[in-house]
């Protein structure tokens, strides 16, 4: 009986693979079933904000953030314009004016997305990280939670800061000391704030149950 069941299972698996639908492995991303409460235009639980319903100040913010279809955190934050305005300013400083290399900015964002299992953030920023010059081997180290010993000093510290602050809820003394040596006190505050910024974004997207447009690039359950 057991041999028959095993044979039947192998036959089913063979049919699935032959049809081009191999079951996902830990290294593959798959689409989640979309819940009934998602809005079809936004891919989240919120209806889209219509530009013509906004006042002039809100329209300026809408246009500045490139909000067009209701997808993503910029659109969601428009439900609270003061939050949108203040967080836009903070994000702009941390990403573009803090002095941190663009590739390291993207690395900090990716490790945050990985530790928060934030599919939307990861799927948006993996291509941006490659464009900024972050090597695929480093991206994969973060994506698949691999050991960091092969990374450069700066990259390793940023990954360990993110893993400690979010995953372990604790950054150890050695990691902190290495971070200060490499980036200075202000740099560490900037990196920690960048991690916090995208952790907050991940929480907002989680509450909204924001789905990606197509297929997630992040393997999560």
Spans of features found by a protein language model:
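Bacterial N-terminal signal peptides
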Residues: 9-19
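Hydrophobic alpha-helical segments
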Residues: 24-221
């Amino acid at each position: 009986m057991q041999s028959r069941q095993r044979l039947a299972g192998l036959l089913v698996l063979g049919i699935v693979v032959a049809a081009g639908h191999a079951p996902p492995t830990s290294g593959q991303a798959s689409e989640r079933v979309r819940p009934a409460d998602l809005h079809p235009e936004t891919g989240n639980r919120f209806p889209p904000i219509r530009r013509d319903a906004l006042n002039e100040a809100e329209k300026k913010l809408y246009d500045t953030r490139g909000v067009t279809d209701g997808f993503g955190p910029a659109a969601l934050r428009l439900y609270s314009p003061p939050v949108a305005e203040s967080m836009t300013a903070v994000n702009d400083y941390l990403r573009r004016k803090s002095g941190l290399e663009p590739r390291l900015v993207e690395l900090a964002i990716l490790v945050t997305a990985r530790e928060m299992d934030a599919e939307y953030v990861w799927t948006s920023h993996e291509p941006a990280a490659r464009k900024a010059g972050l090597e695929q081997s480093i991206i994969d180290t973060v994506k698949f939670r691999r050991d960091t010993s092969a990374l450069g000093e700066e990259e390793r510290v940023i990954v360990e800061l993110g893993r400690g602050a979010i995953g372990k809820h604790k950054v150890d003394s050695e990691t902190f000391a290495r971070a200060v040596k490499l980036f200075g006190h202000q740099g560490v505050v900037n990196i920690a704030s960048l991690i916090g910024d995208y952790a907050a974004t991940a929480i907002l997207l989680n509450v909204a149950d924001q789905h990606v447009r197509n297929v997630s690039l992040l393997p999560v359950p």
